[in-house]
Amino acid sequence: MFRSLWHTIGSSLDRYRTYPRIVGETGGKDFIVAHRSADVEALAVAMVRGAYEYQGQKCSAASRAYIPSNLWPRVKERMLAMLAEIKMGDVSDFRNFMGAVIDKKAFDRIKGYLDEARTKPGVTFVAGGKCDDSKGWFIEPTILQVEDPKYRTMCEEIFGPVLTVHVYADTKWEETLHLVDTTSPYALTGAVFAQDRSAQETANRVLRNAAGNYYINDKPTGAVVGQQPFGGARASGTNDKAGSILNLIRWVSPRLVKETMVPPKDYKYPFLGAE
């Protein structure tokens, strides 16, 4: 839709007195990538909170994760333990961590991804996958593990409680970072988990353009309005950082005014008469 709007505006430039400005924040395929030095407990909590808060119906929700082979067994164990405790139900009851997805259209779309995943080799349901629309539109918090890092649910925004995990060889840190950077057209949010400072710096460099809001050792969602300017680039929008002066400037046309108090009275510059 945003591309269509921009195309329509661009094709109508002759109607405007100046080049119109457009600000957009569209969506994301937000990532968590963990180094072999990551804190397992912090990582598992971030994956659960980041993927399943608000049923994953946030443009910043974690929806793809890259976990090293040395950590995955422990991370999976901790996530499964937490998911076993999670309650779903009426969101007015604060004992419930999750509620229903927003409507039948969303329910059917998310269910479609899960139904397709069941038919694909190399895709494993680690947790969840059940859908129930008998009363409301409820989808279990789901973890998919995929062998193919370019599988559909690693690339496309689902906007639901589905987290897809690719387990990589723990010696291939930089190669995996390049994979993260090139897999999705979006660049909204992302998180890196590493206690190794050198690994963090490598990630900062490789993922320079992969996320407009970039988190280190924290979940990639939950930017506080008025405290953390928010926005992303690539297919995620114009990265004008809502909640900051950068966004405000996009809505105004700056003008510089110069007033000369002592104007020159001779066209010749001083250097023109120099010997």
Question: Positions of the model-derived regions?
Answer:
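C-terminal core of ALDH-fold dehydrogenases
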Residues: S4, K130-L144, W173-M261
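Short loop/turn motifs at secondary-structure junctions
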Residues: T18, A61, I158, Y186-A187, ...
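Glycine-rich nucleotide-phosphate-binding loops and adjacent flexible coil segments
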Residues: P161
